């Protein structure tokens, strides 16, 4: 699948961006207060759908964790990539821990 037709309209998000067990250096993109333990691709798809964002699963492996089978998610872009990541992180945290 070519991703050129999605450029500018969608962002690619990896579950590792939201993983509390990883450091920023290892790929986490959100503060620890918003991160959760080992998020899955399925969880990200559910959270995006709950927020009204179109999302599609992609195949692939995170380069820093090539042994991990969790693939990325293509998510509709609303605002900047940082804003989309933060929005998903807050909802993921709320669903997981009720905070």
Swiss-Prot record:
GO biological process: SRP-dependent cotranslational protein targeting to membrane, signal sequence recognition
Keyword Cytoplasm in record: yes
Keywords: Cytoplasm, Ribonucleoprotein, RNA-binding, Signal recognition particle
Locations listed in the record: Cytoplasm
Molecular functions (GO terms): 7S RNA binding
Gene3D superfamilies cross-referenced by the UniProt entry: Signal recognition particle, SRP19-like subunit
Main location: cytoplasm
InterPro entries for this protein: Signal_recog_particle_SRP19, SRP19-like_sf, SRP19_arc-type
SUPFAM superfamilies named among the record's database cross-references: SRP19
One Pfam family matching this protein: SRP19
Subunit field text: Part of the signal recognition particle protein translocation system, which is composed of SRP and FtsY. Archaeal SRP consists of a 7S RNA molecule of 300 nucleotides and two protein subunits: SRP54 and SRP19.
Purpose: Involved in targeting and insertion of nascent membrane proteins into the cytoplasmic membrane. Binds directly to 7S RNA and mediates binding of the 54 kDa subunit of the SRP.
Protein name stated in the entry: Signal recognition particle 19 kDa protein
Organism: Ignicoccus hospitalis (strain KIN4/I / DSM 18386 / JCM 14125)
Phylogenetic lineage: Archaea, Thermoproteota, Thermoprotei, Desulfurococcales, Desulfurococcaceae
